[in-house]
Regions:
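N-terminal signal peptide
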Residues: 2, 9, 18-42, 49
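CBM-like carbohydrate-recognition segments
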Residues: 32-130, 134-136, 142-143, 149, ...
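Alpha-helical positions within canonical tetratricopeptide repeat
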Residues: 43, 99, 103, 153-156, ...
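Long alpha-helical scaffolds in large eukaryotic adaptor/regulatory proteins
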Residues: 95, 139, 146, 208, ...
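Extended ligand-binding groove/face enriched in aromatic
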Residues: 102-106, 110-208
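Active-site cradle of extracellular carbohydrate-active enzymes
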Residues: 201-215, 219-276, 289, 293-296
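Membrane-interfacial loop- and helix-cap regions that link adjacent transmembrane helices
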Residues: 249-251, 257, 284, 307-313
Length: 465
């Protein structure tokens, strides 16, 4: 571990104190206050209650683990359930509130699938590496924050994260097209199998970096190194640390879709911070963290407030995109714990952005409903699980100064691992299944909006203008 880790808590506390004082000059929200730890905890509790109103998997006749969907049955694809549980695990970690822990555990275990690798058969027709990766990252988070372990006869958090990583590291998912890298979709029959993208590889990179640190295992770190290098070499990440969406294998990944999404930056930024920590402060990873951090602030914050450049100006965001700001806040916060040199720059920024987030949570019916556009200062009538998850992540992570940094198996981690997890998965020769219209329109995290890059909203990004 880097020698700076020992002074991390005091440094973060000092920066947070400054940030809270600075935020006092900002107009406070009508409903939520975040001026003190008690205020933050109270606001986070209300936001957690609000976001869980969108979840019905713990009700009779419903499927545990998923938000209503997929379309046309509801707004949400399978992956966003996994993302929700990550937000709720962080909520517990920062606040200590155990209200939803049993619901989270049931949800996370219900969706593991028969091979305990987060590939349940009922989502095969829209299963992407990124979808699986989000569930794997939530399992990894559970291990890192010592979220209560499942019963001994159930899959364990660390083993689930390893299973996801192992299935994605299998040679069956890494072909020679475009010089390597993961495809977006997993089954060859799926729409999008011919597309390689940043988020699929970013989730894999992120998991590899975190497993390397947690287990002190160089094999995972080698995969993380290799993945970062490939993403740069193929042009998905440019010299200015802009991360683009992806490209098709038929063009050898030369037809890069230049859409930029904040969760791509966030997933790579957190992974790079873990690599910095694992390598005991290697200057290569420090430079990468700094470069990507500056790019993230440059591209995805307006006046120090989180902003989704691909879609927010004209509100063309898909349901998926409406959840990205929360990952930015949550993962940048964790970065300050494992790469403490970033704290002085990041924590005041996130405090300002969180204040803007709660300022607009004034919607009906009770004046606490959150919208999506934080820079406007007013409620924008855009409501949903993603919008509320965003604010929950932004608010709860303000308590980082009193939270323990992610643990490892050498520093108090309790989750049991399995280096062979996922090895029994038949994950690369899936029998083709009929693809429905709904699957074609929106399979996985990135919807047909990405593959349909001719849509007017994305013309300027596709042409680099």
């Amino acid at each position: 571990m880097p020698s700076t880790t020992g002074i991390m808590a005091s440094r973060i506390s000092r920066v947070l104190a400054f940030a809270l004082l600075f935020a006092g000059d900002i107009v406070s929200a009508q409903s939520f206050k975040i001026d003190s730890d008690d205020d933050i905890t109270s606001a986070a509790r209300s936001l957690a209650d609000n976001v869980m109103t969108y979840y019905h998997g713990n009700e009779s006749g419903q499927t545990p683990g998923i938000l209503p969907g997929p379309p046309p049955a509801g707004d949400y694809y399978w992956w966003e359930g996994g993302a929700l549980w990550g937000a709720m695990i962080d909520y517990w970690h920062y606040t200590g509130d155990t209200t939803y822990n049993d619901v989270v555990t049931e949800a996370m275990l219900w969706q593991v699938g028969p091979n305990k690798d987060y590939m349940p058969p009922n989502v095969t027709a829209s299963l992407g590496n990124d979808d699986q990766g989000f569930w794997g990252m939530s399992a990894m988070l559970a291990a890192e924050v010592n979220f209560p372990d499942p019963p001994s006869d159930q899959p364990q958090w660390l083993a689930l994260a390893q299973a996801v990583f192992n299935t994605q590291a299998d040679p069956g998912r890494h072909d020679t097209t475009c010089g390597g890298g993961l495809r977006w979709q997993i089954p060859f029959a799926n729409n999008g199998y011919n597309y390689k993208n940043s988020i699929a590889n970013g989730c894999f990179f992120n998991l590899g970096a975190r497993l390397a640190r947690y287990l002190n295992n160089q094999t995972y770190a080698d995969w993380a190194d290799k993945t970062w290098d490939w993403v740069q070499s193929v042009g998905f990440m440019d010299a200015d640390y802009r991360i683009y969406d992806g490209a098709h294998v038929e063009s050898n990944c030369t037809d890069i879709n230049r859409a930029q999404f904040s969760y791509n930056n966030a997933v790579f930024l957190l992974g790079a911070a873990y690599m910095f920590n694992y390598t005991d402060g290697d200057s290569k990873w420090e430079d990468r963290v700094n470069g990507l951090l500056d790019a993230t602030i440059r591209d995805f914050f307006r006046n120090n407030v989180a902003y989704e450049i691909a879609c927010e100006e004209h509100m063309t965001c898909t349901t998926d995109m409406l959840s990205f700001k929360g990952y930015v806040h949550r993962w940048m916060t964790t970065m300050t714990q494992i790469a403490p040199f970033t704290a002085e720059k990041v924590l005041p920024l996130l405090q300002t952005s969180a204040q803007a987030a709660v300022n607009q949570c004034t919607g009906p019916p009770d004046g606490t409903t959150c919208g999506f556009q934080w820079t406007s200062g007013t409620f924008d009538n855009s409501v949903g699980a993603g919008q509320t998850m965003n604010v929950l992540g932004a608010v709860s992570s303000l308590l980082v100064g009193r939270a323990r940094a992610p643990v490892t198996n050498a520093t108090g981690g309790t989750s049991a691992g399995d280096p062979n997890a996922g090895s029994s998965s038949d994950s690369f020769t899936n029998t083709p299944v009929p693809i429905t219209t709904g699957d074609r329109v929106g399979a996985g995290i990135l919807t047909a909006l990405i593959l349909g890059s001719a849509l007017g909203t994305f013309v300027w990004m596709s042409t680099g203008k």
